């Protein structure tokens, strides 16, 4: 599959062949869903916590005798039916991570790349380099490309000037090739790869 290569001035500077085994797979919504849920689960801090009956400060004395008062029997004022009492089966500090095999994770990344290519939302840039770190200059160039929500993936080594210019532009993310992931690809409308990124992704995912 061939696609055109453009520069930041929206000028066509060549063509590149995209490997079908990386950019030509059928869309698998089930695989993408599993991968996104796996990523979001790993991001959760899991610091949620409520106190059980053994953790609440207070007396352990029985509030009133068992029989003879006419009231319902109670054994502790720390029970959940009392104000300030415990919560039963409440959340505890834990990890939300779950397993997902490398084979599925690799397939999910290739599927995400293929989905963007099939939708016509995959652009290839000659290079992600900026002459100045000024955001205004880069924003104007991206406007000529029609990019309002995009993820730009470059090679292993990012251009520091480009990153500084791009980091204050809303709805724009810049990642190195090794940071490419399904969640960030899908959350932006357009995926922009540099020529270096294409070569390195194909070498890693073939």
Curated annotation (Swiss-Prot):
Protein name (Swiss-Prot/TrEMBL): Large ribosomal subunit protein uL4
Function, in words: One of the primary rRNA binding proteins, this protein initially binds near the 5'-end of the 23S rRNA. It is important during the early stages of 50S assembly. It makes multiple contacts with different domains of the 23S rRNA in the assembled 50S subunit and ribosome.
Tagged with keyword Ribonucleoprotein: yes
Top-level taxon of origin: Bacteria
Gene Ontology process terms (BP): translation
Subunit-structure text: Part of the 50S ribosomal subunit.
Cysteine disulfide partners in this protein: none
Family to which the UniProt record says this protein belongs: Belongs to the universal ribosomal protein uL4 family.
Region Disordered: start-end pairs: 62-85
Cited InterPro entries: Ribosomal_uL4, Ribosomal_uL4-like, Ribosomal_uL4_dom_sf
Keyword terms of this UniProt record: Ribonucleoprotein, Ribosomal protein, RNA-binding, rRNA-binding
HAMAP family: Ribosomal_uL4_B
GO molecular function: rRNA binding; structural constituent of ribosome
GO CC term, one of those recorded: ribosome
